């Protein structure tokens, strides 16, 4: 579902008040925050439930959410067992 226009975009308070002059690394757990132009060319470390993953902000990522770039589940690949079936 799309967020109502009258509510505006959601940016976490911890990201709004972040001062990159004193602390250049931005670390957050707010995956639902929208990426705004203030964060262009910066790297934000987002928590995926296990570790912090770096997300580099570009012009293409503006208006999207931080959680779209951080996977929370491990991608499993099926491996061949190495045994061939006999006919």
Curated annotation (Swiss-Prot):
GO terms for biological process: ribosomal small subunit assembly; translation. The keyword Nucleus does not apply. The keyword Mitochondrion applies. InterPro entries: Ribosomal_uS19, Ribosomal_uS19_CS, Ribosomal_uS19_SF. GO terms for molecular function: RNA binding; structural constituent of ribosome. Keywords: Mitochondrion, Ribonucleoprotein, Ribosomal protein. Pfam families: Ribosomal_S19. It comes from the Eukaryota. It is found in: Mitochondrion. One of its GO terms (cellular component) is mitochondrial small ribosomal subunit. Belongs to the universal ribosomal protein uS19 family. PANTHER family: RIBOSOMAL PROTEIN S19P FAMILY MEMBER, SMALL RIBOSOMAL SUBUNIT PROTEIN US19M. HAMAP family: Ribosomal_uS19. This is Small ribosomal subunit protein uS19m. It comes from Dictyostelium discoideum.
